[in-house]
């Protein structure tokens, strides 16, 4: 029955699927897969025919290990996860395959082949084949049968066919006269070879020892392939978990060798018997463990008999610790790093406390009473959890750091504390010396970075000029937190700051204003700050060769989608911004009205300018609330600017409600959106005098608004109020210093339209019974010419205009209009009064 033809077995209608399965069982072929499902009809028939109908002249039979790759790829798709043992390609054949062949083979083996490189496919396929071969070898090793093969080269040596229920022998003779006899057994297959026809020798192999050796070799090769396919970052993490102190400079090959050495030579530290598992249990590959979730790893650890590992319970184990336990803690003791070699006796170890699992057991520091932990890089500390970092910082003696306690510190603050503490432990402590007084900055010492215009850190300089040095004091709030930032950090080069002169604006400042501390950005670089005033530091000669390049100020306005976050500020290269702006404004015909830099400078400056030019009174809180209310009622007005900011910065669209909630807070910086909104609400145009470009820039929602409000703008961080020269805070007209107009010493003379000598006599009829009436004199008309009876002769002086250079751009024209507009408005009002007087005198 088993000598059936392949074509007959596959296509004969008398054989159904269940008949083929029964036939396979009778012929010694396993018709089931490893997962319990039945093999396909074609595969069962192929195994039956290949086992019992070998082709004539074949010397290797069905166990040939040199099958072509095309035969491997031609396996039917109905049974993709099954490959006969003899169809596995070798390691060299897999390396020589093309990528499409590797994908087809990976698909048949049930592996992931999409978006995989050629090297990843080769490693995964070799690992899968080694695993399948190890399973097949372990299955065969558990069988108590002996497989031997007998061959009789002599044509006269007859081979006897015997049917035994438990043994299976196969003899082949190349002679056509020697009938082949087969012994059939569903579980045992033996082959014997006899070099002589009369003395057949049976060579038996011990499958148990061979299978154990083969499984161990396949496990080592599978581990090597898995380590080669892993990323370098994962290898470094695994090496750190296994006890490596420094993995920064190690290459991938060195990492693999270290991991394999740790796997082969575990630490001899004792392990509780409850954590030991069955020695026959093999740990899963490292790559598969890292792909699993933490919950799955915890379940595997529970099944493996987990109690404690490296002093941690299961709830405190992270992913790397779980992988370390599953790789090393199931069959062997817990690995630990070797302690630092020292000739002196180490004190007894302190009681175990919650500490990170990275690094070796800590050693107590000399007389400091703290435990010295191994030095870790910033990358290793970043990979740790915040709880472990805080535990390590507590062991290093953390009480307070930069005004923050342990609960207020974030992950970055804890990492900075650990790194600074490690540096202090690394450097030897110097001998105690008496404290020296803090000297002042003298000589030719150059500061390492440009001076900040205003800074959170102010400097108290001593009077001793022996040695250069500074003493920095932190300005903290009542609760220990840093105060909010309101004024940006504008750096000033000290070599360009002149000493204050008598009569200047700087010398007129009060002592309280000069010594007032300001709250701004904290400069991370080391710098030298002014002594008494943020505007006039007293510094001596500096070295120009040590000057640093500074950033240019931004000439344009800043639009921000997060008002609470101050923009990055440029470095100011001028002398003092307020003095320079005052000089620039005076050259343009304006007076600077300073406002406080508390974050409300935009709204305060608009209040002052509106009050001076139009007489309307507002507070900065009212203007801020008006802006927020208008944007809430008109969200489309705000959405356009937020979309523009999102496109320019290539980030997600900010929330309108988030912007409004931040802008409604007092002290939040105003931006271009607020200026546009105020222009729409107040129906005015804002003319910004920018200190950096020394030019005016018009900002308005519409160009047809008649009123223009000038403002001063200092390098993207501060607004001031500008008032035309001659106007006080109440909006009244005063003496004018407009360029191009002659200034009058006294008050403007009254306009006289009709001289007193030529005033005509007007006869009025006035009685008590009738209302008074004004009768104009008759006008004599002679010929075609009309002679007026009243000849006005005004006595206004002619204005003396100086020669004006031709205008070059629109900004100069707007500047000229701003200077002439107050004078013209005054003249127009006087002309209107004269017109009314003429009408009254003529009786109209």
Swiss-Prot record:
Keywords: Hydrolase, Protease, Thiol protease, Ubl conjugation pathway. One of its GO terms (molecular function) is cysteine-type deubiquitinase activity. Residues 590-725 form the OTU domain. The keyword Protease applies. GO terms for biological process: DNA-templated transcription termination; protein deubiquitination; proteolysis. It comes from the Viruses. Its EC number is 3.4.19.12. Residues 137-216, 332-341, 354-364, 504-518 have a biased composition (Low complexity). It holds the Pfam family Rho_N. Residues 472-485, 526-535 have a biased composition (Basic and acidic residues). InterPro entries: OTU_dom (IPR003323), Papain-like_cys_pep_sf (IPR038765), Peptidase_C85-like (IPR050704), Rho-like_N (IPR011112). Residues 136-223, 261-287, 326-377, 422-541 are annotated as: Disordered. PANTHER family: OTU DOMAIN CONTAINING PROTEIN, OTU DOMAIN-CONTAINING PROTEIN DDB_G0284757. This is Putative ubiquitin thioesterase 232R.
């Amino acid at each position: 029955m088993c000598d059936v033809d392949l074509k007959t077995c596959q296509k004969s209608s008398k054989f159904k699927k269940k008949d083929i399965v029964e036939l396979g069982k009778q012929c010694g072929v396993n018709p089931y897969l490893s997962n319990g499902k039945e093999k396909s009809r074609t595969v069962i028939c192929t195994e039956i025919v290949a086992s019992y109908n070998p082709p004539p002249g074949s010397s290797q039979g069905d166990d040939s290990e040199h099958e072509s790759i095309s035969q491997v790829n031609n396996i039917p798709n109905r049974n993709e996860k099954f490959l006969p043992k003899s169809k596995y390609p070798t390691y060299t054949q897999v390396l020589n395959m093309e990528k499409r062949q590797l994908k087809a083979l990976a698909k048949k083996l049930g592996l992931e082949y999409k978006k995989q490189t050629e090297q990843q496919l080769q490693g995964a396929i070799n690992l899968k084949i080694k695993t399948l071969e190890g399973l097949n070898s372990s299955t065969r090793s558990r069988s108590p049968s002996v497989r031997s093969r007998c061959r009789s080269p002599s044509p006269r040596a007859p081979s006897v066919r015997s049917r035994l229920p438990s043994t299976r022998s196969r003899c082949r003779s190349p002679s056509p006269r020697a009938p082949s006899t087969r012994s059939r057994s569903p579980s045992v297959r033996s082959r014997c070879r006899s070099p002589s026809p009369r003395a057949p020798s049976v060579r038996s192999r011990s499958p148990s020892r061979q299978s154990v050796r083969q499984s161990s070799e396949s496990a080592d090769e599978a581990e090597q392939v898995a380590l080669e396919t892993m990323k370098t970052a994962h290898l470094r993490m695994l090496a750190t978990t296994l006890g490596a102190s420094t993995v920064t400079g190690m290459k991938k090959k060195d990492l693999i060798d270290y991991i394999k050495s740790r796997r082969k030579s575990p630490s001899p530290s004792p392990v509780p018997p409850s954590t030991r598992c069955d020695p026959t249990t093999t740990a899963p590959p490292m790559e598969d463990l890292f792909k699993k979730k933490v919950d799955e790893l915890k379940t595997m650890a529970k099944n493996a008999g987990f109690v404690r590992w490296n002093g941690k319970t299961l709830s405190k184990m992270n992913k790397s610790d779980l992988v370390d336990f599953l790789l090393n803690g199931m069959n062997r003791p817990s690995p630990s790093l070797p302690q630092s070699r020292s000739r002196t006796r180490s004190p007894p170890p302190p009681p175990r406390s919650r500490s990170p699992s990275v690094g070796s057991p800590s050693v107590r520091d000399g007389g400091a009473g703290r435990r010295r932990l191994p030095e870790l890089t910033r990358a290793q500390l970043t990979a740790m959890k915040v709880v472990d970092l805080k535990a390590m910082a507590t062991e290093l003696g953390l009480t307070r750091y930069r005004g923050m306690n342990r609960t207020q510190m974030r992950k970055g603050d804890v990492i900075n504390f650990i790194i600074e503490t490690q540096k202090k432990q690394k450097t030897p402590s110097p001998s105690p010396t008496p404290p020296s007084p803090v000297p002042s900055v003298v000589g030719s010492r150059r500061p390492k970075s440009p001076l900040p215009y205003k800074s959170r850190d102010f400097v108290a300089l001593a009077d001793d000029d022996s040695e250069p040095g500074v003493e920095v004091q932190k300005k903290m709030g009542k609760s220990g937190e840093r105060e909010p930032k309101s004024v940006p950090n504008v750096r000033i080069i000290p070599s360009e700051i002149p000493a204050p002169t008598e009569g200047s604006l700087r010398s007129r400042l009060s002592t309280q204003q000069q010594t007032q501390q300001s709250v701004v950005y904290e400069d991370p670089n080391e710098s030298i700050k002014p002594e008494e005033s943020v505007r006039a530091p007293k510094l001596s000669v500096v070295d120009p060769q040590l000057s640093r390049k500074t950033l240019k100020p931004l000439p344009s306005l800043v639009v921000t989608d997060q008002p609470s976050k101050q923009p990055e500020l440029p470095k100011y290269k001028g002398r003092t911004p307020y003095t320079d702006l005052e000089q620039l404004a005076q050259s343009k015909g304006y007076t600077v009205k300073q406002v406080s830099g508390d974050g409300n400078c935009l709204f305060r400056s608009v209040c002052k300018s509106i009050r001076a030019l139009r007489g309307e009174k507002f507070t900065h809180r009212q203007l801020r609330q008006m802006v927020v209310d208008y944007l809430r009622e008109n969200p489309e007005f705000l959405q356009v600017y937020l979309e523009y900011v999102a496109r320019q910065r290539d980030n997600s669209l900010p929330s309108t409600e988030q912007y409004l909630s931040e802008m409604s807070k007092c002290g939040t910086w105003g931006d271009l959106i607020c200026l546009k909104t105020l222009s729409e609400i107040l129906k005015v145009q804002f003319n910004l005098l920018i200190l950096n470009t020394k030019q005016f820039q018009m900002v308005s929602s519409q160009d047809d608004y008649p009123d223009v409000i000038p403002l001063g703008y200092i390098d993207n961080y501060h607004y001031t109020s500008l008032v035309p020269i001659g106007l006080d805070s109440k909006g009244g007209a005063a003496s004018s210093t407009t360029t191009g107009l002659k200034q009058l010493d006294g008050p403007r003379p009254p306009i006289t339209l009709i001289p007193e000598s030529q005033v005509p006599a007007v006869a009025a009829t006035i009685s008590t019974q009738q209302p008074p009436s004004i009768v104009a004199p008759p006008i004599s008309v002679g010929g075609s010419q009309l002679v007026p009876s009243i000849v006005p002769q005004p006595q206004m002086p002619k204005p003396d205009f100086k020669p004006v250079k031709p205008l070059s751009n629109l900004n100069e024209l707007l500047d000229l209009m701003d200077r002439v507009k107050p004078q013209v408005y005054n003249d127009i009002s006087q002309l209107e009064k004269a017109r009314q007087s003429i009408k009254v005198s003529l009786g109209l």
